[in-house]
Amino acid sequence: MGNENLRPWERQDGETEKAFSAFKAYLEMEDRNVTSLAKRLSKSRQLLVNWKQKYNWQERCIAWDKSLQEIEYKTAV
């Protein structure tokens, strides 16, 4: 199964369980701050920065936010 079949906020091909777990925690953060996440998860900031870049967290968060906005719009109309 290739990434093209996955929604961006789902675990991606090659993404470790630990990296995906950190991504989910990042996705749920109000301010989405890697330094705060590192403290919360007791992980090194550099590790999280590497995962953020390697697994495209920023783009995936944008897709997630857009999906939520579409759902909110559809339920409001």
Regions found by a protein language model. Give the residues of each.
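N-terminal, charge-rich alpha-helical recognition modules
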Residues: 1-77
